[in-house]
Amino acid sequence: MDSVQIEQKSYEMPPRDGISIAHFLTVADVERSAHYYEKVFGARILTMGDGNAPPYLQLANIWMILNVGGGPTPDKPKVTLSVPDPNHINSFMNIRVADIQACYELWKSRGAEFITEPIPKYGETRCYIRDPDGYIIEVGQSTELKYG
């Protein structure tokens, strides 16, 4: 392969061409987490897995893979996956929205636990949600970013 097509109209998994992004989350309970992302954000559950394969969800233009963790495995011999400590996060999902107040109200009504209400900061308005496993999800609306 000489090149990778980044911009595409389809976000199929597996991709027929180009790439698709999948966000892997290590969770304590795959069923609980799958239904949380379905209820709060409207993610589509594609498969709940079969005990060996993990659940796959589609949320907007990304894929989510939920797994209970474990390891090491032959393809990652020194890596163990575990649910995060909710007070020590090293990465998080960032959802960009057109109307943060509307998303805040809708997702809160669906059970999202927001750490704060939306707050203006650094050219955007943002807030954070904590999911059932302690992951934080940034929700942001750009207020100063210009395209073109």
Please report, for each region that a protein language model flagged, where it lies by residue.
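Vicinal oxygen chelate
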Residues: 2-22, 44-95, 104-130, 141-148
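Conserved active-site tyrosine of GNAT-family acetyltransferases
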Residues: 33-38, 107, 134
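Conserved catalytic-loop position in the HRD/HxD motif
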Residues: 99
